[in-house]
């Protein structure tokens, strides 16, 4: 049986971890980094880039580069008005669902997230040296049922059996408390990431991690701080030059990168210069953007965002039934907690210095890996008791939401309640399932609807309809309704608002596999072309440097083989390139043997193109698409 990996599928960055014995290990990706940008790009040549490679080309390819896709997971098109304004890529309405359109192809948010998850899966497989099929994936604690189901669907598309969906603050608490199982303390986990904010209050003791309450805001994170800076520098430039830089997608992407960089710098400095040369041009010539941004100005720009942080904190403490003074530690999680103002707010609100002992970028993935270890049986003496973040209920007479399960109820849980008909001789009822805290049904999130029919005609109030809500350990809801008189029952597993069917998910899984094969084929082609390019370069170089040392009868043959390789490089297939390289290498081998014999065994043998590029280089770079040309000098045996 293989390992269960832990994945933090973040708005800005993602991270993967796995249990190695009794300790979790964060896995470095192929670029050597412990986190991977949650960015996807589709190039004009059809290549699909994920992570750092996608981020590097974002400025020149903004409309085909997808970032912050997590903000659209499990949400309807009419629910994302604010988010879609921040995206330079095209977001369309397809049957009420939010979709991304790139190069005339339409992708669901789950499909895009699956591309990121595939990268995480591959990273783990490279590290472990074995196939990975199971994972624990984290979500913001305040994600609703539809968003959780969408995350699970993304995992399935990526070829992963998602064993558990776990809340990010809870995962962080697991990582924080793994070595503190014998202690008893009450902890607040303050998680401010790239796109979401969560606050969870937990009680840790004797290996039990019990969530007392959770609250948050799924529209608040680092992206929002970046946008404040973008608007500020764009407005300042417009005042000076009369040009709105936000109207051009490439320029907007430059502003986004500069804003993110400035925000990060202001965490360690009190001021920073935003310098973007040649940001635009007029008839008068090029224009440059140079603006100094102080930390005080940044804090003033984001004052409303900082204010929004405290309300969820107040609700979480109130719902936990704990006093502020009972909180032993406040653990900071998420990259945005590095902002000094955020740390100051936390200190003032909780009346104590926040705990910075965990890596805010990695701790969530570590916690997910620990949960994977618990499910696998590798981690013992750990019991996790999480809660549902929002109340769940149904619509009843008058459009009222009647709650069956209150927010912050420990999961898994099951609740039953008996309802009746609203009219005489009513033979069917519609069960409208809702999630939220508002008293009226229309103000809450619709999770699903289903009908229970064939109810025997009776006066209103007589039929007994038993409604059962069942939340599993992933926080995903199952609802059933049963006519107690006839025993007839209808049930529904609440699906994501994305409405992805099993057939659609299966098709997306096949597409993902095809892309993986295409990516491998493309990588092989690039590797082969890089080796061929190096062989052409080094052959030409040695032909010139060795001169008449090459036998006169061999030179035309060698030059002919070189021309064949050049032609294959311009117009040929991978197979023709390999064939031409093999032929050229064979010629070089014969020449190298001749030179060695003519110079004698005491002399240094000239380093041939066949040896330097086709031989050793192909071995070294067979698994790396980024082949670099190596320059070298031919050492004549007489010149030392």
From Swiss-Prot:
Region feature (Disordered): 487-526, 593-640
Comp. bias (Basic and acidic residues): 501-526
In-chain residues carrying the UniProt-annotated modification Phosphothreonine: 196
Compositionally biased residues, Acidic residues: 630-640
Pfam families in the cross-refs: HSP70 (PF00012)
SUPFAM superfamilies attached to this UniProt entry: Actin-like ATPase domain (SSF53067), Heat shock protein 70kD (HSP70), C-terminal subdomain (SSF100934), Heat shock protein 70kD (HSP70), peptide-binding domain (SSF100920)
Induction: By stress conditions e.g. heat shock.
Gene Ontology MF annotations: ATP binding; ATP-dependent protein folding chaperone; unfolded protein binding
Stored InterPro entries: ATPase_NBD, Chaperone_DnaK, Heat_shock_70_CS, HSP70_C_sf, HSP70_peptide-bd_sf, Hsp_70_fam
Keywords from the named record: ATP-binding, Chaperone, Nucleotide-binding, Phosphoprotein, Stress response
Known function: Acts as a chaperone.
Family designation: Belongs to the heat shock protein 70 family.
NCBIfam families per the UniProt record, alphabetical: PRK00290.1, PRK05183.1, prok_dnaK
The protein's name in its UniProt record: Chaperone protein DnaK
Species assigned in the record: Pelodictyon phaeoclathratiforme (strain DSM 5477 / BU-1)
Recorded name of the encoding gene: dnaK
